[in-house]
Amino acid sequence: MENLGRKLVLAKQGKDLTRLMKDEAWQVRCEVAKNENNEVLDVLVKDENWMVRSEVLKHRRDSDLDILVNDKDHWIRSEVAEIGRDKDLDVLVKDKEFTVVLEVLKHNRKKDIDFLKNSDDFIIQSKLRKLNV
């Protein structure tokens, strides 16, 4: 049985990725996701571990963004908002998690600001006041 360190080295070198993308250790799958191998990324975008999905997201592939905009984890949705595709921001401005919405507001889109003016979330209202809107 290979040790974790050996598998991490192989993944970093871009070797044996199709085997390593199925490894039980999330650290190995994270390292695999750093490679720009579309076949591997297509699988890892649905990984159970949010840190693996976050690594996939760093490649900014449209197909991944289309999936991850609806991710169960608010940290992933915040990262999608940070990237700032208009169609994603249109979805995420209505997110129930304020951290996601705050990330949307960083793009200063007028339609988002107008939509959120009616929000009853104290934190969002505070952010809008800081934007002087």
Where are the regions that the model predicts?
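Alpha-helical scaffold segments
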Residues: 1-133
